[in-house]
Structures are given as structure tokens and as C-alpha cells.
């Protein structure tokens, strides 16, 4: 199977980064004296996950551009993925991978890789990570809400669906999950990465906090959405490598 210098990094699951970060907290104990660490640890892990995902996407683009000169021209001249942090960049690279696979195997459809079992395995693994970590102590109420409600926004119908009629792109997520990404992942990423949480005007106001669906703004949902995107992109990249000639 073809391999590049980026392959190992791209195929390293972000869920392992989450596991390692939470494992590092085991020595802190679970008494009340550990609670001040909660926001620092969860925010630091969030930034590590978003940063790693952005670097992965850049590496995927470079690997595609190394093999496909037409894609290289398109990537360098017409695509504007920036830091690869927003929705358009993630959905764009998702489609770039699909098109790269379809150039070799024209019958390929993403539904061949992504089904209910694929999603169930990911969600079960993530939930096990949460339940075996200090988060079950620090964020017990938020975890209970997550367990009771994650299936309402994260389902097989929300990921990797077929193209809509007259559309040229495949949707990575349907509108419900896409909106959640932008609301609870991307917006929070910008607050944390640019340190705008230090400005009161950038914080959610009381009206936003009082809304019934504000409880989705938790690190449990943020981590899950990031890891779900990562798992989808890894599966596509692995499929791409498996059908690419060893010498290109």
C-alpha cells in the first residue's frame, strides 16, 4: 500500500490524543481540590484536538497534491481552506478525498464506508473514554445530559449522505449536525485559540445561556464531533491509500 511521510500522522486517531490527555489526570485524584483543573484541562485538550485536526487536513491536501497535479493546481490557485478550521474547509477536504478515490474507482460512494455500525463503534469508544476518566467526576451533570441526548443530533442519517439533486458536493454532515459544529465547536475554537474569552463581549449572554439547547455547549459534544470528523477523514484517506498504486 502506498505510504507518504504524512500517512502515519493522518491515520493516528484523535481519540488516542483524548485518551492520553485524560490518562494524565489520573494522578490528580478526584477530590474537590482537583476541580479547579477542569476547565484548564478540558480547554487544553479541545485546542490540541482542533489543532491536530487542522494539521491533518493540511497534510491530506499536500498528499493529494503530491500525487495529482491537477489537484495541486486547483489547491494552490482556487481553493481557500485557510487554517482548515471552518466548516467549508472540512467539507471541502472530505469531497477532495472522495473525488480522488473516484478517479481510481468511479463506482465508489461514501455510503460504502459509513453506516450505522461505523457510527455506533465510534460513539461507543468515545463514551467509554468519558466514563473511565476524571470527567465523570468533574462534569457529571454534563455527561448525563450527553448520554441522554447525543443520539438526537448524531445519527447515521446525519453523516456522509448522498449528494442532493443538482449538487456537485457530498455533505459531510446534514444541516443539524453541521449547525452544531459551527455553534459549539468552531465558535468555541475561535474564542479559545484567539483568547477572546478574556473579553466579556465575546462570551454568551444570559439569554443564550438560558436557552434549552445551550446544554449542548459542552466539551463532551465538542470532542465527539471533532473525533467523528477525524474518523470519517481517516477512513477515506485509508481507502485512498489502499487503491493507490505503490509507485506513483
Predicted feature locations:
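Charged alpha-helical initiation segments
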Residues: 1-47, 51, 56-82
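Polyanionic, low-complexity intrinsically disordered segments
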Residues: 2-16, 20-23, 138-248
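Intrinsic-disorder-associated interaction segments
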Residues: 3-7, 11, 46, 86, ...
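Glutamate identity and glutamate-enriched acidic tracts
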Residues: 5-8, 33, 39, 54, ...
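Generic hydrophobic secondary-structure signal
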Residues: 46-49, 53, 57-61, 109, ...
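Helix-loop junctions and short alpha-helical segments
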Residues: 61-169
Amino acid at each position: 500500500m502506498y505510504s507518504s511521510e504524512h500517512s502515519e500522522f493522518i491515520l493516528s486517531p484523535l481519540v488516542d490524543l483524548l485518551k492520553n490527555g485524560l490518562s494524565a489526570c489520573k494522578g490528580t485524584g478526584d477530590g474537590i481540590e482537583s476541580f479547579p483543573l477542569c476547565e484548564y484541562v478540558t480547554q487544553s485538550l479541545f485546542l490540541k484536538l482542533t489543532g491536530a485536526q487542522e494539521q491533518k487536513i493540511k497534510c491530506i491536501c499536500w498528499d493529494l497534491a503530491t500525487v495529482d497535479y491537477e489537484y495541486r493546481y486547483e489547491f494552490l490557485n482556487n481553493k481557500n481552506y485557510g487554517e482548515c478550521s471552518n466548516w467549508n474547509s472540512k467539507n471541502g477536504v472530505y469531497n477532495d478525498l472522495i473525488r480522488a478515490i473516484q478517479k481510481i474507482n468511479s463506482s465508489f460512494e461514501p455510503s460504502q464506508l459509513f453506516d450505522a455500525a461505523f457510527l455506533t463503534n465510534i460513539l461507543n469508544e468515545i463514551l467509554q473514554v468519558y466514563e473511565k476518566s476524571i470527567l465523570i467526576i468533574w462534569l457529571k451533570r454534563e455527561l448525563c445530559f450527553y448520554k441522554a441526548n447525543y443520539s438526537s443530533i448524531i445519527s447515521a442519517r446525519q453523516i456522509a449522505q448522498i449528494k442532493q439533486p443538482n449538487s456537485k458536493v457530498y455533505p459531510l454532515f446534514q444541516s443539524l449536525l453541521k449547525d452544531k459544529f459551527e455553534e459549539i465547536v468552531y465558535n468555541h475554537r475561535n474564542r479559545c485559540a484567539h483568547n477572546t474569552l478574556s473579553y466579556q463581549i465575546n462570551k454568551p449572554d444570559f439569554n443564550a445561556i438560558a436557552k434549552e439547547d445551550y446544554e449542548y455547549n459542552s466539551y463532551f459534544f465538542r470532542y465527539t464531533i471533532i473525533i467523528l470528523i477525524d474518523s470519517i477523514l481517516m477512513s477515506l484517506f485509508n481507502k485512498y491509500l489502499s487503491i493507490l498504486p505503490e509507485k506513483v
